[in-house]
């Protein structure tokens, strides 16, 4: 994963006197080539082109339903992508007719990518010149296990390029979970019931799978940045590899189980899937209603109450789309000022994976016992076992990341092992604990838990 600008690994130790605390003056940030912007644009264009090609093929073969669903998934995600980029860049308050026109014809990511490349080339040509407009940024860093506060200057051009990067990160998540996930699931379903896989559909499924994996990986990184906004965070290649393997196994196993379950029950599977999605969708709103809190008004200063409500609904739909296929790594709380729970909520993570594991086992058992006409030449028991094992392995990589590879794991009050130990402690009968431990030790253990 690239960064628009990065801080040297060993900042120049130049303490600056402050009334509150000592600050280390960091070296000026070095801007890097925005590979993530190019990659996100490539995924968007590739998936859009392959989806439109399959729409043309389905129309030529008079397969109306397949054509309609394929085109609908493409259009919905593309429109949401355009709205996301317009919202992040605040284009409605600016006079940019060309950008708005490109968004209107669903080519907004392309023009934004060109703008980012032009900005990068401008920075590259003026690398040795000092910018007249700069701002100071302060972040905490963990250096040799010690927390230090670092301050550095960020130029206006670098900040603009960083805004492009952040916009594309959010765009990639919108595309992944509101477009690529349903597209990939549906194309897998069509391939399963039609018993043929043309090259165009393979290309579309590959683009969708890469988009989903990339979006889920970004979801983890953005979750860490949101929870630890005061810290400068670095993820090394090993951490990114662990997250990628975890997310790939989790998403592929989950989607394959959904496809096999849907192919087995046909229309009978629709109520179960719709109910599952609606529970995730309305859960944050039910908690918000029960809390009795006011609707947050700090999302955008120029937004009316209706505009704020539209943004909250869009965020909730994205949150439900993420949790339907994988863990969102964040818990949405509409009653909070920041809209998310910034705590390390092990209980929410454990509940999500426990419920999803039970769901996957149930759907796999339905496929095993009732999927007579699905995959006639394959052993259903072996397929079911492999899918459950793949999902369990993804959980193992998730636990590995949080226990050993999380960049700020030293800030955890409790880690994965502590949480599992607490769960095991609660499973013991209380009478046995009371009889085997002195009162002082019992109170101490309960306080730790």
From Swiss-Prot:
Belongs to the XK family. GO terms for cellular component: plasma membrane. It is found in: Cell membrane. Keywords: Cell membrane, Membrane, Transmembrane, Transmembrane helix. The chain crosses the membrane at residues 35-55, 68-88, 98-118, 174-194, 202-222, 241-261, 269-289, 306-326, 357-377, 382-402. Expressed predominantly in the placenta, in syncytiotrophoblasts. Moderate levels in the adrenal gland, low levels in the trachea and very low levels in the bone marrow. This is XK-related protein 2. It holds the Pfam family XK-related. It is a multi-pass membrane protein.
């Amino acid at each position: 994963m690239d960064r628009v600008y990065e801080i040297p690994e060993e900042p120049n130790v130049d303490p600056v006197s402050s009334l509150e605390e000592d600050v280390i003056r960091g070296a000026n940030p070095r801007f890097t080539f925005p590979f993530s912007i190019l990659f996100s644009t490539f995924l968007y264009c590739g998936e859009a082109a392959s989806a439109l090609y399959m729409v043309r093929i389905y129309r030529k073969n008079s397969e109306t339903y397949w054509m309609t669903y394929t085109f609908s998934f493409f259009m919905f995600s593309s429109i949401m992508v355009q709205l996301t980029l317009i919202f992040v860049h605040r284009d409605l308050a600016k006079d940019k007719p060309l950008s708005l026109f490109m968004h209107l014809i669903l080519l907004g990511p392309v023009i934004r990518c060109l703008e980012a490349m032009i900005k990068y080339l401008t920075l590259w040509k003026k690398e040795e010149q000092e910018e007249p407009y700069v701002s100071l940024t302060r972040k905490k860093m963990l250096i040799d296990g010690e927390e230090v506060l670092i301050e550095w200057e960020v130029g206006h051009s670098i900040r603009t390029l960083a805004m492009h990067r952040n916009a594309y990160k959010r765009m990639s998540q919108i595309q992944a979970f509101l477009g690529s996930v349903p597209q990939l699931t549906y194309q897998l379903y069509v391939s399963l019931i039609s018993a043929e896989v043309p090259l165009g559909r393979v290309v579309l499924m590959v683009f969708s799978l890469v988009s989903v994996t990339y979006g889920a990986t970004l979801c983890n990184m953005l979750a860490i940045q949101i929870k630890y906004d005061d810290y400068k965070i670095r993820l090394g290649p090993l951490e990114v590899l662990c997250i990628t393997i975890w997310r790939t196994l989790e998403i592929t196993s989950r989607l394959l189980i959904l496809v096999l379950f849907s192919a087995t029950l046909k229309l009978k599977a629709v109520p179960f899937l719709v109910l599952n999605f609606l529970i995730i969708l309305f859960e944050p709103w039910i908690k918000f209603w029960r809390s009795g809190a006011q609707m947050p008004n700090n999302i955008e200063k120029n937004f009316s109450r209706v505009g704020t409500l539209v943004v909250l609904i869009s965020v909730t739909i994205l949150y439900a789309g993420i949790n339907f296929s994988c863990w969102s790594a964040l818990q949405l709380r509409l009653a909070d000022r920041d809209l998310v729970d910034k705590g390390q909520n092990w209980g929410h993570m454990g509940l999500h994976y426990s419920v999803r594991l039970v769901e996957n086992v149930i759907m796999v058992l339905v496929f095993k016992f009732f999927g007579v006409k699905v995959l006639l030449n394959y052993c259903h028991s072996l397929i079911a076992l492999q899918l459950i094992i793949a999902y369990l392995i993804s959980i193992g990589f998730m636990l590995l990341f949080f226990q050993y590879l999380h960049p700020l794991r030293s800030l955890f009050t409790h880690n994965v092992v502590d949480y599992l130990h607490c769960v095991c402690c609660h499973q013991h009968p209380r009478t046995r604990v009371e009889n085997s431990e002195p009162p002082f030790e019992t109170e101490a253990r309960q306080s730790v838990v």
